[in-house]
Amino acid sequence: MLNNAMSVVILAAGKGTRMYSDLPKVLHTLAGKTMVQHVIDAANELGAAHVHLVYGHGGDLLKQALKNDNLNWVLQAEQLGTGHAMQQAAPFFADDEDILMLYGDVPLISVETLQRLRDAKPQGGIGLLTVKLDDPTGYGRITRENGKVTGIVEHKDATDEQRQIQEINTGILIANGADMKRWLAKLTNNNAQGEYYITDIIALAYQEGREIVAVHPQRLSEVEGVNNRLQLSRLERVYQSEQAEKLLLAGVMLRDPARFDLRGTLTHGRDVEIDTNVIIEGNVTLGHRVKIGAGCVIKNSVIGDDCEISPYTVVEDANLAAACTIGPFARLRPGAELLEGAHVGNFVEMKKARLGKGSKAGHLTYLGDAEIGDNVNIGAGTITCNYDGANKFKTIIGDDVFVGSDTQLVAPVTVGKGATIAAGTTVTRNIGENALAISRVPQAQKEGWRRPVKKK
């Protein structure tokens, strides 16, 4: 179906008192992303020409958090209802576009459901998203005559008979811009709350003989709003369960789907195995046959085929080629790069460092601002001293170098191909190819030496 141009209004002016937080409610996160960002992303994916964000409380915090989004900011200085919020945005509506109304605290609304709503909107009428609940207490009821939607009655204004209706309003609707502006201008606050209800436009449209078409979401969770942290935590689990199900059906082995969190996008190959309590953040790519141990955190990284990441390892903004082994308890910080077959063991930290093919840093090591060649062995306790308190410097280690335990490389320094560095050495000057570097103080031995005795 050919759709009209469309703009989206997102209502985000509420304070969120029941969150007991200094943050505006819509800035609380679900799956690592603010609730309102989920909604903005859905609007953009739908192809919205403009996204109007109606804000009130915490405007400065909202603008800072959403500074990279192309939004039209609309102030609602007083919170006088949903209709009043839409009235603030109405001057920005084009007559010939459709206006879709969304909510910043309803984060799981799907693009698929919104597209069905958009497709179902009749010419000159309203598309309305509704659901049926066993217990509709507190929600606006959908009234019908001969099956046709005639209006929405808020719970506080409903009669006993109307309160028996199970079909309720989700608040999400779409209508033509010119029609929306005309109906908004007719709203009154003659109700129990003394507010301007956007829902009253349904009755206004019906009185004009306009058609109102109701569409149901694929899942109830899509239209669940968040008013407190308990509701937010429940939606988090719903979201994570859905993501885990998709991954399992796509061939990823999650050892316990209930103990896996996806806070971004995961691209994966075949026969990937992920153990319990793993967190995936940002954009992560896992190659074929990758294994990730329990308790790992992987963020914005590319992991090549046949890599194995042992438990409790943190990988952030890193790139691993095929057949690398990491951990346990390793940390790869931004800029870490491992070439094919490289190994980083327990309690090894890398930042802005490249470890060559087949090279190994087995344990208790810091490699920062370093370029390490192929088939290099880094002994335990090795440190690249890259920072002088003001500036950072680079360490370059050639192929086939052996670095003994407890070595300090004071950058800037270059170690030539095939060199050997004896254990306990502090390297302050460049080392030539195939040379042995040693800087230990000669060992002294005192025969018959006795330890001091504590005084009683």
Swiss-Prot record:
Region feature Pyrophosphorylase, mapped onto this chain: 1-229
GO MF term list: glucosamine-1-phosphate N-acetyltransferase activity; magnesium ion binding; UDP-N-acetylglucosamine diphosphorylase activity
Keyword Cytoplasm listed: yes
GO-annotated cellular components: cytoplasm; membrane
Major subcellular site: cytoplasm
Domain of life assignment: Bacteria
InterPro entries for this protein: Bifunctional_GlmU (IPR005882), GlmU-like (IPR050065), GlmU_C_LbH (IPR038009), Hexapep (IPR001451), Hexapep_transf_CS (IPR018357), MobA-like_NTP_Trfase (IPR025877), Nucleotide-diphossugar_trans (IPR029044), Trimer_LpxA-like_sf (IPR011004)
Residues the record lists as binding UDP-N-acetyl-alpha-D-glucosamine: 11-14, 25, 76, 81-82, 103-105, 140, 154, 169, 227, 333, 351, 366, 377
Enzyme class, first EC level, given as a word: transferase
Subunit structure: Homotrimer.
Function: Catalyzes the last two sequential reactions in the de novo biosynthetic pathway for UDP-N-acetylglucosamine (UDP-GlcNAc). The C-terminal domain catalyzes the transfer of acetyl group from acetyl coenzyme A to glucosamine-1-phosphate (GlcN-1-P) to produce N-acetylglucosamine-1-phosphate (GlcNAc-1-P), which is converted into UDP-GlcNAc by the transfer of uridine 5-monophosphate (from uridine 5-triphosphate), a reaction catalyzed by the N-terminal domain.
Protein's recorded name: Bifunctional protein GlmU
Protein's organism: Escherichia coli O127:H6 (strain E2348/69 / EPEC)
